[in-house]
Amino acid sequence: MKNTRFVNWWKQDKRYITLLKAVLMALLPLVCCLIRTAAEGRSIGQVYLPSSEWNDELFYFKQVEGIVNYGFPMGYFGFNESHALQLSFAAWSPVLVFPWILWGLVFGWNLLSPVICNIVLMTVTMFVFVWLVKPTWKQLGILTVLFGLYSLFVRY
């Protein structure tokens, strides 16, 4: 009987440690975004999509905007401003922007929507990842450093 109580206590205690790890890792995307924007002298609310170094973000933003407002993309989204053969997705499928479409339909769509949506999706993903994998503190530290150093994740 004593042995069973100890085992149950141990399992329950590990669950709270895993929860703590998952919450800490879930905050990482937001913290990295805050650090990156602070290094640029801005806040997350001042991220302006059209002035992006790459043009893909605006391209996807306009596709989602058309889908949210009209049910399908409006405009020319093919290569060299050509029109796609079917619908207006060119070489891309609607699956690529599907999470943004759902976000836009539920919460509305503006220039900050992709940024907030990406942070929320990365936060949920990090939480679920740590909850399922249950990494050690050392592994969690390594993941944190690697995520922080990979600026493409932080940028998006």
Predicted regions and their residues:
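Extracytosolic helix-loop segments that constitute the early lumenal/periplasmic catalytic or substrate-binding loops
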Residues: 38-46, 56-86
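Juxtamembrane membrane-water interface segments immediately C-terminal to a transmembrane helix
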Residues: 51-54
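Start-transfer (signal-anchor) and selected internal transmembrane alpha helices
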Residues: 1-44
